[in-house]
Amino acid sequence: MIYLDSAATTFQKPAAVQRAVVQAMRTMSSPGRGGYTAAQQADELLFRCRSAAAELFSVPSSEQVVFTMNATHGLNIAIKSLVRPCGRVVVSGYEHNAVTRPLHALGAEVIVAAAPLFSPQETVEAFERALAHEPDAVICTHVSNVFGAILPIERIAQLCRGASVPLIIDASQSAGSLPIDFSALAPAFLAMPGHKGLYGPQGTGVLLCGAG
């Protein structure tokens, strides 16, 4: 079989991932909920995993790494942390339902930074115009899950920093596939699933949090 649906989930998982999952089910106890040996070992494994994620994505501290159920879970946390009810948000034209549905539930005014597909310069200009509306936040996917378009996230992040507007990045399609330098981008939040480009099991995700 030739598998072409990695935008949904990666399959099959590498042998090392399969072994790690089986070992965890056989030996891991409950992290953070006990002082016995197995619980302490689970704590240590969790800490090492957070540290590895911080190193991989250039996050200053492992304390800025939060594990979630998936990218949707992380995006909901980020959105509800920054967007007030009936607030104003700028988004790209490629956002997933994981972004649009919580914004709808909040009654947010959504301004779409619309630009032609595969047009980085016009995309940047669209975000620059949209920022004039003084939004509560900007939400932008790094890579479109439908078209595969890579958005100029570095330049969009620079615009947001210049306007002092918090940025939420959806890295669902890029984490593990494209380089991500969290420190250089300096977003408020960056969300990703564990089961796509990172080749982890479903039901896992990571939310990287800014220091502010």
Model-predicted segments: where are they?
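Pyridoxal 5′-phosphate
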Residues: 1-212
